[in-house]
């Protein structure tokens, strides 16, 4: 299935996006079909959050340049900022050396964390 709709541009439904086979063979999804995605602010290098992606979420992110993730608790897709307005414009997507983690370098508008903090790593320092 194509990642583009002739009327609206990139598909708005992540479930309909298909990952390029050349990319899919390089990503090592876990047994649940997920890969961790580390989200980093492209302007200052701060790590903002970690979320999970399946192949459709990754395909949707690549096609739309919007941070798209898989919620394990809700068993559904979520596009960052769709309800909060705290959007992520994806500038780069990289795969780590083992192929089992994705790095998204993004431009964040508003808070990245669902708590309202700029980053999910603002609190609870362990050392």
From Swiss-Prot:
Entry EC number(s): 3.5.4.19
Record flagged with keyword RNA-binding: no
Stretches of the chain forming a coiled coil according to its record: none
Binding site for Zn(2+): 97, 113, 120
Top enzyme class: hydrolase
Major subcellular location class: cytoplasm
Intracellular or extracellular location(s): Cytoplasm
One Pfam entry name: PRA-CH
Binding site for Mg(2+): 96, 98, 100
Reaction(s) catalysed (UniProt annotation): 1-(5-phospho-beta-D-ribosyl)-5'-AMP + H2O = 1-(5-phospho-beta-D-ribosyl)-5-[(5-phospho-beta-D-ribosylamino)methylideneamino]imidazole-4-carboxamide
Keyword annotations: Amino-acid biosynthesis, Cytoplasm, Histidine biosynthesis, Hydrolase, Magnesium, Metal-binding, Zinc
GO biological process, one term: L-histidine biosynthetic process
Cofactor note: Binds 1 Mg(2+) ion per subunit. Binds 1 zinc ion per subunit.
Cofactor(s) required for function per UniProt: Mg(2+); Zn(2+)
UniProt entry tagged with the keyword Metal-binding: yes
Pathway(s) per entry: Amino-acid biosynthesis; L-histidine biosynthesis; L-histidine from 5-phospho-alpha-D-ribose 1-diphosphate: step 3/9
GO molecular function, one term: phosphoribosyl-AMP cyclohydrolase activity
GO cellular component, one term: cytoplasm
Stated role: Catalyzes the hydrolysis of the adenine ring of phosphoribosyl-AMP.
Assembly information from the UniProt record: Homodimer.
Sequence similarity: Belongs to the PRA-CH family.
Protein name: Phosphoribosyl-AMP cyclohydrolase
């Amino acid at each position: 299935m194509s990642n583009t709709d002739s009327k609206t541009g990139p598909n708005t439904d992540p479930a309909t996006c298909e990952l390029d086979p050349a990319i899919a063979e390089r990503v090592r999804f876990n047994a649940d079909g997920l890969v961790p995605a580390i989200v980093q602010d492209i302007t200052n290098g701060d790590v903002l959050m970690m979320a999970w992606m399946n192949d459709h979420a990754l395909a949707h992110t690549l096609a739309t340049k919007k941070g798209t993730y898989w919620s394990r608790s809700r068993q559904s897709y979520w596009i960052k900022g769709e309800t909060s307005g705290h959007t992520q414009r994806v500038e780069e997507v990289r795969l780590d050396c083992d192929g089992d983690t994705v790095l998204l370098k993004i431009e964040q508008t508003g808070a990245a964390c669902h708590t309202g903090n700029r980053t999910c790593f603002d609190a609870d320092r362990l050392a």
